[in-house]
From Swiss-Prot:
Function of the protein: The RecF protein is involved in DNA metabolism; it is required for DNA replication and normal SOS inducibility. RecF binds preferentially to single-stranded, linear DNA. It also seems to bind ATP.
Species this chain originates from: Ruminiclostridium cellulolyticum (strain ATCC 35319 / DSM 5812 / JCM 6584 / H10) (Clostridium cellulolyticum)
Protein name: DNA replication and repair protein RecF
GO molecular-function term, one example from the UniProt record: ATP binding
Residues binding ATP: G30, D31, N32, G33, Q34, G35, K36, T37
Keyword Heme attributed: no
Gene Ontology terms describing biological process: DNA replication; DNA synthesis involved in DNA repair; double-strand break repair; SOS response
GO cellular component, one term: cytoplasm
Length: 372
């Protein structure tokens, strides 16, 4: 999968930016605050339907303007090319078109462009709480399996309804009669989410282990293990998981009523990232954590390729300066077949790491100052 070109209008600090890309490496360099990351963000937006930096589309509009637009042309291996357009007018709903055909739901965007983002903030996957690890998995799964994204949306809506119900039961006990309906709806989508997460984590863990063996010379063993918020076995199918979850919802009912929210379910899941069977978060050094995230990200690329028969595009946002020379070389050797977009402050930083098929773009104040 290749992004052939990008057009930005009134996006962040870009007024009218048009770029033709190399099929391999595209390096955007310049001082901080010039608009390099905005280019990667726009590509990511076309893959996922949302920014990785803000949940407010209004923040993407160039100051003093009323709207923004993004357009990319995507070429798929053995498939039809796709033109993706995203536009937003202030105080209106975001508009998305694929090959000039408007789509009403973001879920329909999934699968038209696969993108893996790697930034220094990805250390949060290790360092911070379950939300960051769930987000990491959910973003990738949503791209390769649009039905998963739909189930996440449904679960969010159902949880909101169920939680409202729980908060009002004490003042209106008759509402208890409707709880079972919401439990069944929740259990149905939750079971599908849980099964997908379990399968994904098994695949990712195996691929990350292989990558980590190369990176560390087999001196460390990494694992990425799914931890469901209630007990399931590896053999449980979707129907069995649904039944188990219904039992858990019944058991936690009184506690949920007291607290006013649903205390068990996929929204409370976590993943254990281990090095040599020890928690990476608790016991891993900074270097071990960086190596683990690097292995996970390369595994993510391989997993997307295995699931879709397409390499995703890779967005490296100010990552190279965070890696030592050995990790830099390992990363670049691992992505030779992947179209890659890189931001940095100094293009000389790469030395001989890049192939001849590389384009350099200097970004100054949202403008492409030079292209070599």
């Amino acid at each position: 999968m290749i992004v052939k070109n990008l057009v930005l209008e009134n996006y962040r600090n870009h007024t009218n930016t048009r770029i033709l890309f190399s099929d391999r490496f595209n390096i955007f360099y310049g001082d901080n605050g010039q608009g390099k990351t905005n280019i990667l963000e726009a590509i990511y937006l076309c893959a996922s339907g949302r920014s990785h930096r803000t949940s407010r589309d209004s923040e993407l509009i160039k100051f003093g303007c009323e709207n923004f637009s993004i357009a990319v042309h995507v070429s798929k291996t053995g498939g039809l090319d796709k033109d993706i357009e995203i536009s937003y007018y202030e105080n209106q709903k975001k508009q998305i078109k694929i090959n000039d055909i408007p789509i009403k739901k973001i879920g329909a965007l999934m699968g038209n462009l696969y993108a893996v983002l790697f930034s220094p903030e990805d250390l949060f996957i290790v360092k911070q709480g379950p939300t960051e690890r769930r987000r990491f998995v959910d973003i990738t799964l949503s791209q390769i399996k649009p039905s998963y994204f739909y189930n996440l949306q449904q679960m969010s809506k159902i949880l909101k309804q169920r939680n409202t119900l729980l908060k009002n039961i004490s003042s209106n006990p008759k509402l208890m009669d409707t709880v079972d309906i919401w439990n069944m709806r929740l259990a149905e989508v939750a079971a599908a989410i849980i099964k997908a997460r379990r399968t994904f984590s098994i695949m990712l863990s195996g691929m990350a282990e292989n990558q980590h063996n190369f990176l560390t010379g087999k001196s460390e063993k990494i694992s990425f293990d799914y931890r469901c918020s209630f007990q399931i076995s590896g053999q449980d199918d979707t129907e069995q998981i649904e039944k188990l979850y219904l039992v858990q919802l019944e058991k936690s009912m009184q506690r949920d009523i007291v607290l006013g929210y649903t205390t068990v379910g996929p929204h409370r899941d976590d993943y254990d990232i281990m090095i040599n069977d020890k928690s990476l978060k608790l016991y891993g050094s900074q270097g071990q954590q960086r190596s683990a995230v690097l292995s996970l990200k390369i595994a993510e690329i391989e997993l997307v390729k295995k699931a879709t028969n397409q390499y995703p595009v890779l967005l490296l946002d100010d990552v190279m300066s965070e890696l030592d020379k050995n990790r830099q070389k390992y990363l670049m050797d691992s992505i030779k077949e992947v179209q890659t977009f890189i931001t940095c402050t100094n293009k000389e930083h790469f030395g001989n790491l890049l192939s001849a098929n590389s384009n350099f773009f200097k970004i100054v104040g949202g403008n492409i100052h030079s292209c070599m």
